């Protein structure tokens, strides 16, 4: 759940606060939830809220444009929280964050890219008891009427998947990742994606 530095509660945050009998407002007033960019706070099983775990991620000053670097910090915190939840399904509620010289489609695309890229895990063959990423489904709720955001999210996921593919090749041992192996991977990509 995205939280700005403003101490006022509105939108989804107000609904969650009312459902929790004022818990969120108390935590904000005690500055346990600050809203500072990238700051993340974990709360287990908030009374009145139908979620096993909740993470509050700071989005900075309300109604103020932020830099791309700050937005990347927010996306990284959201992605880290989603994976740390160890849940199969995650709901992300974020306010519309305004980034300098960027539109809403770009912000959604970057979030999709971070979520996908952060899910990467390298599995070394032969090593037992390797941790597995259990996250299978992510739903994003955003207060925006802009059209085409699902396409922007999909684009971000595709870029993130490409990044993960590159990481997998880079992490493959040199005795396996030979020129022949790379050529086979390239051929497989061209068979799967006609534009490659």
Model-identified regions with their sequence ranges:
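Short amphipathic alpha-helical segment within the helicase RecA-like ATPase core
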Residues: 1-196
């Amino acid at each position: 759940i995205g939280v700005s530095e403003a101490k006022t509660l509105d939108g989804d945050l107000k609904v969650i606060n009312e459902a929790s009998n004022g818990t969120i407002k108390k935590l904000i007033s005690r500055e346990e939830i600050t809203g500072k960019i990238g700051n993340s706070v974990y709360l287990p099983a908030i009374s009145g809220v139908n979620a096993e775990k909740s993470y509050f991620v700071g989005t900075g000053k309300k109604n103020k444009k932020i830099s791309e670097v700050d937005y990347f910090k927010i996306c990284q915190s959201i992605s880290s929280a989603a994976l740390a939840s160890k849940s199969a399904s995650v709901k992300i509620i974020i306010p519309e964050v305004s980034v300098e010289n960027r539109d809403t489609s770009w912000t959604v695309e970057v979030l999709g890219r971070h979520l996908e890229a952060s899910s990467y895990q390298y599995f070394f063959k032969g090593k037992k008891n390797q941790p597995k990423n259990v996250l299978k489904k992510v739903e994003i709720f955003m207060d925006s009427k802009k059209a085409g955001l699902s396409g922007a999210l999909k684009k971000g996921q595709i870029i993130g998947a490409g990044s993960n593919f590159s990481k997998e090749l880079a992490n493959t041992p040199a005795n396996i990742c030979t020129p022949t192996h790379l050529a086979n991977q390239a051929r497989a990509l061209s068979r799967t994606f006609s534009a490659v």
